[in-house]
Amino acid sequence: MHPARPALWAAALTALTLLRGPPVARAGAGAVGAGPVVRCEPCDARALSQCAPPPTAPACTELVREPGCGCCLTCALREGDACGVYTERCGTGLRCQPRPAEQYPLRALLNGRGFCANASAAGSLSTYLPSQPAPGNISESEEEHNAGSVESQVVPSTHRVTDSKFHPLHAKMDVIKKGHARDSQRYKVDYESQSTDTQNFSSESKRETEYGPCRREMEDTLNHLKFLNVLSPRGVHIPNCDKKGFYKKKQCRPSKGRKRGFCWCVDKYGQPLPGYDTKGKDDVHCLSVQSQ
């Protein structure tokens, strides 16, 4: 993950908190709030000892905590002052919000282009986001696009009846045709997705049958080695596989210093051959052993 992304996510969550309302209590206080919560470290005596003396009146009329997870006290912003995610907090009863004509409200708060306004009169986040059109104000293109969303609908909407009151039969046929077209398109998409899933499943099954058990064990071992901090060759066994992914007759443990690892004989599925104990022997010949 890029090192700057956590800071950007924290800033975005802070901007959403400014738009939604005053921040909830600190995580250590046991308060539970809705939405995302940024957990801050508790303000202990060590953290408070590093704070500078707070400003005093008349330069500062109200003291508030620093923005973010800060523990020190600073002057609160007054109504109408510029504010943002990285600036000081607004005073009691005020909320930092973007300008009414701001095109990008979150970006404005990140860049400090908001202003402190009365919390009771400030709008919520939905005020600055695109709102859904009312049912009676749907445009003609949107209505045509959504005409077939309800399969059982054969009668057009109220405002469409008013527009086509002289041709009710044509209006009904128009809606029915659009519904059939939408259903056929939906069936086509579902069929293509099912076909793609079937192809993926068949390819995975084919790959599973092409690779034998030895090849799968070797891949699992190599994947496991990626997550090990300390690699010990003595504790790692990589199987000896043939070209088709099955076990070769002779399998050996890794050497330990000057001592060679012992070998043994197995069948193509990796099962030790019965009646052939080779543990502790340095040289083993499995060519004459018949696999079962």
UniProtKB/Swiss-Prot annotation:
<dbReference type="GO" id="GO:0010906">
    <property type="term" value="P:regulation of glucose metabolic process"/>
</dbReference>
<feature type="disulfide bond">
    <location>
        <begin position="214"/>
        <end position="241"/>
    </location>
</feature>
<dbReference type="GO" id="GO:0042567">
    <property type="term" value="C:insulin-like growth factor ternary complex"/>
</dbReference>
<dbReference type="GO" id="GO:0005615">
    <property type="term" value="C:extracellular space"/>
</dbReference>
<dbReference type="GO" id="GO:0005634">
    <property type="term" value="C:nucleus"/>
</dbReference>
<protein>
    <recommendedName>
        <fullName>Insulin-like growth factor-binding protein 3</fullName>
    </recommendedName>
</protein>
<dbReference type="InterPro" id="IPR036857">
    <property type="entry name" value="Thyroglobulin_1_sf"/>
</dbReference>
<keyword id="KW-0340">Growth factor binding</keyword>
<keyword id="KW-0732">Signal</keyword>
<dbReference type="GO" id="GO:0045663">
    <property type="term" value="P:positive regulation of myoblast differentiation"/>
</dbReference>
<dbReference type="InterPro" id="IPR022321">
    <property type="entry name" value="IGFBP_1-6_chordata"/>
</dbReference>
<dbReference type="GO" id="GO:0043568">
    <property type="term" value="P:positive regulation of insulin-like growth factor receptor signaling pathway"/>
</dbReference>
<feature type="glycosylation site" description="N-linked (GlcNAc...) asparagine">
    <location>
        <position position="118"/>
    </location>
</feature>
<dbReference type="GO" id="GO:0043065">
    <property type="term" value="P:positive regulation of apoptotic process"/>
</dbReference>
<comment type="subunit">
    <text>Interacts with XLKD1. Binds IGF2 more than IGF1. Forms a ternary complex of about 140 to 150 kDa with IGF1 or IGF2 and a 85 kDa glycoprotein (ALS). Interacts with TMEM219.</text>
</comment>
<dbReference type="GO" id="GO:0014912">
    <property type="term" value="P:negative regulation of smooth muscle cell migration"/>
</dbReference>
<dbReference type="GO" id="GO:0000165">
    <property type="term" value="P:MAPK cascade"/>
</dbReference>
<feature type="glycosylation site" description="N-linked (GlcNAc...) asparagine">
    <location>
        <position position="137"/>
    </location>
</feature>
<keyword id="KW-0053">Apoptosis</keyword>
<feature type="disulfide bond">
    <location>
        <begin position="51"/>
        <end position="72"/>
    </location>
</feature>
<keyword id="KW-1015">Disulfide bond</keyword>
<feature type="disulfide bond">
    <location>
        <begin position="252"/>
        <end position="263"/>
    </location>
</feature>
<feature type="signal peptide">
    <location>
        <begin position="1"/>
        <end position="27"/>
    </location>
</feature>
<dbReference type="GO" id="GO:0005520">
    <property type="term" value="F:insulin-like growth factor binding"/>
</dbReference>
<dbReference type="InterPro" id="IPR017891">
    <property type="entry name" value="Insulin_GF-bd_Cys-rich_CS"/>
</dbReference>
<dbReference type="InterPro" id="IPR000867">
    <property type="entry name" value="IGFBP-like"/>
</dbReference>
<dbReference type="Pfam" id="PF00219">
    <property type="entry name" value="IGFBP"/>
</dbReference>
<feature type="disulfide bond">
    <location>
        <begin position="90"/>
        <end position="116"/>
    </location>
</feature>
<dbReference type="InterPro" id="IPR009030">
    <property type="entry name" value="Growth_fac_rcpt_cys_sf"/>
</dbReference>
<feature type="disulfide bond">
    <location>
        <begin position="40"/>
        <end position="69"/>
    </location>
</feature>
<feature type="glycosylation site" description="N-linked (GlcNAc...) asparagine">
    <location>
        <position position="200"/>
    </location>
</feature>
<dbReference type="GO" id="GO:0048662">
    <property type="term" value="P:negative regulation of smooth muscle cell proliferation"/>
</dbReference>
<dbReference type="GO" id="GO:0040008">
    <property type="term" value="P:regulation of growth"/>
</dbReference>
<feature type="disulfide bond">
    <location>
        <begin position="83"/>
        <end position="96"/>
    </location>
</feature>
<keyword id="KW-0597">Phosphoprotein</keyword>
<dbReference type="GO" id="GO:0031994">
    <property type="term" value="F:insulin-like growth factor I binding"/>
</dbReference>
<dbReference type="GO" id="GO:0001968">
    <property type="term" value="F:fibronectin binding"/>
</dbReference>
<feature type="disulfide bond">
    <location>
        <begin position="43"/>
        <end position="71"/>
    </location>
</feature>
<dbReference type="InterPro" id="IPR012211">
    <property type="entry name" value="IGFBP-3"/>
</dbReference>
<dbReference type="Pfam" id="PF00086">
    <property type="entry name" value="Thyroglobulin_1"/>
</dbReference>
<feature type="domain" description="IGFBP N-terminal">
    <location>
        <begin position="36"/>
        <end position="119"/>
    </location>
</feature>
<comment type="function">
    <text>IGF-binding proteins prolong the half-life of the IGFs and have been shown to either inhibit or stimulate the growth promoting effects of the IGFs on cell culture. They alter the interaction of IGFs with their cell surface receptors. Also exhibits IGF-independent antiproliferative and apoptotic effects mediated by its receptor TMEM219/IGFBP-3R. Promotes testicular germ cell apoptosis.</text>
</comment>
